[in-house]
Curated annotation (Swiss-Prot):
Keyword Transmembrane: yes
Record note on quaternary structure: Interacts with gelatin and type 1 collagen. Interacts with the actin cytoskeleton.
Native organism taxonomy: Eukaryota, Metazoa, Chordata, Craniata, Vertebrata
The protein's name: Anthrax toxin receptor 1
Pro residues: bias regions: 503-562
Gene: Antxr1
Binding residue positions for a divalent metal cation: S50, S52, T116
Family affiliation: Belongs to the ATR family.
Cited SMART domains: VWA
Regions of this protein lying in the Cytoplasmic compartment: 341-562
Length: 562
């Protein structure tokens, strides 16, 4: 593999480990309130113990101690490596917290001295990464290298070569430069310039970059949704966490499922965001199978582990629910048919009696208060006897009288007493103890209750209207049936439009019978008187409506004599 290829692979591996560190800083909080990382990966500290840091070793130790306590995942492993003229592994890779505590004690006892051979420290880290990969773990690795000086040209070449070798094994490399460092050299040793943390204010400022390292290097898996799936069905899983877009190339991010600690299946996610991944999951055919969720940031070269487990369970299909809904729908349809069928089939005509008119004693028909009318002494009109002997008063507008009655002309000496008030208002009702009923305060739900009451009245009115139309027991009727009858002969247009279907048919036209045969008249036995000549003018016919039709004559009309 060429140098560029090894560099790219190593950078991807280091990115994965660094992202895990960032997740630790973002994913949770420690008991003391500081940021923490729950990512599961291998963390290597490569520390410069050359003579230039002789008087600043305590600052370096406290920096490592504080940073180590931020990674609290039980699946995280840690190693301490120091370098000067040669590299030394103070503590091998371990997840045992007691051994980590002892390793920190050994680190505190280190006496700095010697030259700055950074490549020696990278060699010790690459050896452990290679050994762990050969064991089949393939865990993501993060390397944090700290130095305070500028490397000579040949030492820089060796350091860059060993850093590329670590990247080829799947590690992500971060560099911390203190005071007199060469930032260009550290940018080439680390994955990129963004993976370099400069501390220009000296060793006492190391505590200020702990949060930045956690934020940039931690990738953690917090949860999976759903965590329980149906056996034998395909599904998609949403991986919740932090730092998923911290990879150098998001196209190389993979979701990994380790099934029953034996088979590992990798799937490319549909969506990659900083706080979640949307991944297709493999089909788990048996009930009780478990799949441990992992994430790879370098196309499967190494993986960030987690404690998130996806389990399978037995699920029933939705056919039972569909059948139940279908039965419920059929029952509802039958109920509606039973209710509305008599309305469509049985025709019952009833005359609904008019509603009784309630006479209000307090108000008129138009809803206005009862009007007070003038009191007239009817004795002057002749009421109660001749001449109005007995006194009688009449209030206009009461007991059959109308307002127009008040406009009648009164007698000259009639006495009229006008009321003090024109309208008579109803008095408020009192309780049994002669106390008025207090008005109830308006509640917050009064508008809602009013609208619901109005809706209920509307529904009730519609129900009563339909209920009245339904036939009662004992009612008889006939089902409506529409039949279309085809006529073989087309209808003829009437000859005379003056006759309608409601008038009787016209009378047939009368035809007189043929005249009788001509016979000679017999000889006259006596002279006949002369026939008077008809008058020149005829009297007008009587003014009477013409008959509808004339009856036919019983005999032929006489012929005029010559």
């Amino acid at each position: 593999m060429d140098r560029a290829g090894r560099l790219g692979t190593g950078l991807r591996g280091l990115c994965v480990a660094a992202l895990v560190l960032v997740c630790a800083g973002q994913g949770g909080r420690r008991e003391d309130g500081g940021p923490a990382c729950y990512g599961g990966f291998d963390l290597y500290f490569i520390l410069d113990k050359s003579g230039s840091v002789l008087h600043h070793w305590n600052e370096i130790y406290y920096f490592v101690e504080q940073l180590a306590h931020r990674f609290i995942s039980p699946q995280l492993r840690m190693s301490f490596i120091v370098f000067s003229t040669r590299g030394t592994t103070l503590m091998k890779l371990t997840e045992d917290r007691e051994q980590i505590r002892q390793g920190l004690e050994e680190l505190q006892k280190v006496l700095p001295g010697g030259d700055t051979y950074m490549h020696e420290g990278f060699e010790r880290a690459s050896e452990q990464i290679y050994y762990e990969n050969s064991q089949g773990y393939r865990t993501a690795s993060v390397i944090i290298a700290l130095t305070d000086g500028e490397l000579h040209e040949d030492l820089f070449f060796y350091s860059e070569r060993e850093a590329n070798r670590s990247r080829d094994l799947g590690a992500i490399v971060y560099c911390v430069g203190v005071k007199d460092f060469n930032e260009t050299q550290l940018a080439r040793i680390a994955d990129s310039k963004d993976h370099v943390f400069p501390v220009n204010d000296g060793f006492q400022a190391l505590q200020g970059i702990i949060h930045s390292i956690l934020k940039k290097s931690c990738i953690e898996i917090l949860a999976a949704e759903p965590s329980t799936i149906c056996a034998g069905e395909s599904f998609q899983v949403v991986v919740r966490g932090n730092g998923f877009r911290h990879a150098r190339n998001v196209d190389r991010v993979l979701c990994s499922f380790k099934i029953n600690d034996s088979v590992t299946l990798n799937e490319k996610p549909f969506a990659v965001e900083d706080t979640y991944l949307l991944c297709p999951a493999p089909i788990l055919k048996e009930v009780g199978m478990k799949a441990a969720l992992q994430v790879s940031m370098n196309d499967g070269l190494s993986f960030i582990s987690s404690s998130v487990i996806i389990t399978t369970t037995h699920c029933s299909d939705g056919s039972i629910l569909a059948i139940a809904l279908l039965i419920l729908f059929l029952l509802l349809a039958l109920a509606l048919l039973w209710w509305f069928w008599p309305l469509c089939c049985t025709v019952i005509i009833k005359e609904v009696p008019p509603p009784p008119v309630e006479e209000s004693e307090e108000e008129d028909d138009d809803g206005l208060p009862k009007k007070k009318w003038p009191t007239v002494d009817a004795s002057y009109y002749g009421g109660r006897g001749v001449g109005g002997i007995k006194r009688m008063e009449v209030r206009w507008g009461e007991k059959g009288s109308t307002e127009e009655g008040a406009k009648l002309e009164k007698a000259k000496n009639a006495r009229v007493k006008m009321p003090e008030q024109e309208y008579e208002f109803p008095e408020p009702r009192n309780l049994n103890n002669n106390m008025r009923r207090p008005s109830s305060p308006r509640k917050w739900y009064s508008p809602i209750k009013g609208k619901l009451d109005a809706l209920w009245v509307l529904l009730r009115k519609g129900y009563d209207r339909v209920s009245v139309m339904r036939p009662q027991p004992g009612d008889t009727g006939r089902c409506i049936n529409f039949t279309r009858v085809k006529n073989s002969q087309p209808a003829k247009y009437p000859l005379n439009n003056s006759y309608h279907s409601s008038s009787p048919p016209p009378a047939p036209i009368y035809t007189p019978p043929p005249p009788a045969p001509h016979c000679p008249p017999p000889a006259p036995s006596a002279p006949t008187p002369p026939i008077p000549s008809p008058p020149s003018t005829l009297p007008p016919p009587p003014q009477a409506p013409p008959p509808n039709r004339a009856p036919p004559p019983s005999r032929p009309p006489p012929r005029p004599s010559v």
